[in-house]
Structure formats: structure tokens, C-alpha cells
Design a protein with these regions (language model features):
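A polyanion-binding, active-site-adjacent surface
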Residues: 2-213
Length: 213
């Protein structure tokens, strides 16, 4: 994955932000390559985002690491025992996930957080491989509507689906391969600041997921 060159626009953007950097990260050496998933290969739970953050995963080389969305997510994961640490700051911070794997559908940060359909299609094979390699997987939590929509789109490519899937926080959908999909509001700073998602809502959803694993 980290050697992928399928999407020239995304490669250019990753290189650009790795050179220009953000003021508070000016001394950091940016990863600047596609970002793979990470976690327990025997995971029963998959947490799926859309794409790595420009100055989060693209900087640190790990999904939901080094950005505010990750800060919120890992505080919640730690509180219910899924993560051994309450934060995710860099690839060698000693973080361990319990029966959980975290990835993004798109492996590179898109400009303005708006990926093209071609770019999403280019990445779908990587997601396919992740799903196949996680042989004990039972539940997928999709963070945000776009990640949810692309997960459904992926399944529609591979299975005949008649059910209508609508993004609703905390809903439970049975997928045709026996897995369960649960939509969740994305823990973005905007959603957290406007109380669309808060610690209580996230913990409640995660506790529900733990019961069905």
C-alpha cells in the first residue's frame, strides 16, 4: 500500500503538505505516503474512517494518530478497554488495540477532504484485502456518512443487496457476508464542538458493539 502511485492528485497533495507542513509541526518529519490500517489481525471489530488527516495520519504514518479526531476516539476506546492508551500520538507510542483494527477506506489524504470517485475506486481493492485478511471480523463501525456510503458501495459491488441502508448513528445493519455494520458520527472537531457527537454518545455506541462481538 505505501508504494501505491495510482492517484497522482493524492500523491502530489501528500508531498506538498509534507514539505510545507503546519506551523506547529514544522520540525516533524512527515510520513507523506499512503497510510495503512493497524491493530489486531485477529480483530472482531473494524473501525473505518474515510481518509487519513493531512496533518494527522499523513504526518505520523498511522490512521487517527496525531490529530484531534484521533484524540477523541482513543480517549473513548481507552475508557472501555479497547485501547491500552488514552491517546494515539505516533507509530512507536506503544499503543495496542484489543481485538480491534482501524483503517481508512482511502489511504491518502484528499485535498479539502474531498476524494474523487476514481480515487475511492482505486482504493477499494485495499479495503477488500483488509476485509478478507480479518478472518474473525464481526462488526464494522463506519465513522461518518462518507465512510458508511463507501462501505455500502463496496458491498454492493460484491453482493446482491436489496436492503436500503441509511446513515443513522447507532443503527445496526446486517451485511450479506454475515458481518454487522454500525454507522457512527465522525469524531471530527466540528462534530465534537457542536455536540453532534460527544463522549457519552460514543461510549454508549462502543458498549453496544462490545455486547454483540
Amino acid at each position: 500500500i505505501i508504494k501505491c502511485k495510482k492517484c497522482p492528485r493524492l500523491i502530489r497533495f501528500s508531498k506538498k503538505i509534507s514539505i510545507t507542513k503546519r506551523k506547529q509541526n514544522i520540525l516533524d518529519v512527515y510520513w507523506g505516503k499512503p497510510v495503512t490500517g493497524f491493530g489486531d489481525i485477529n480483530a472482531k471489530l473494524l473501525i473505518l474512517g474515510l481518509a487519513p488527516a493531512a496533518h494527522g495520519g499523513t504526518r505520523t504514518g498511522r490512521a487517527f494518530t496525531g490529530d484531534k479526531s484521533g484524540d477523541f476516539l482513543f480517549r473513548c476506546l481507552h475508557k472501555i478497554g479497547i485501547s491500552n492508551l488514552p491517546s494515539s500520538t505516533h507509530r512507536k507510542d506503544g499503543l495496542i488495540l484489543n481485538s480491534t483494527y482501524i483503517t481508512n477506506f482511502l489511504k491518502c489524504a484528499p485535498p479539502s477532504d474531498k476524494p474523487l470517485n476514481l480515487e475511492l475506486n482505486n482504493c477499494s481493492n485495499y479495503f477488500d484485502n483488509e476485509i478478507k485478511n480479518l478472518t474473525k471480523l464481526k462488526v464494522i463501525i463506519s465513522l461518518g456518512k462518507i465512510a458508511f456510503d463507501n462501505c455500502i458501495k463496496f458491498y454492493k459491488k460484491n453482493f446482491i443487496i436489496k436492503e436500503k441502508f441509511i446513515f443513522k448513528h447507532g443503527a445496526k445493519y446486517n451485511l450479506p457476508d454475515g458481518k454487522i455494520l454500525i454507522p457512527c458520527y465522525h469524531p471530527s472537531p466540528r462534530n465534537v464542538n457542536t455536540k453532534v457527537i460527544d463522549t457519552q454518545k460514543m461510549i454508549k455506541l462502543l458498549k453496544f458493539v462490545k455486547k454483540i462481538l
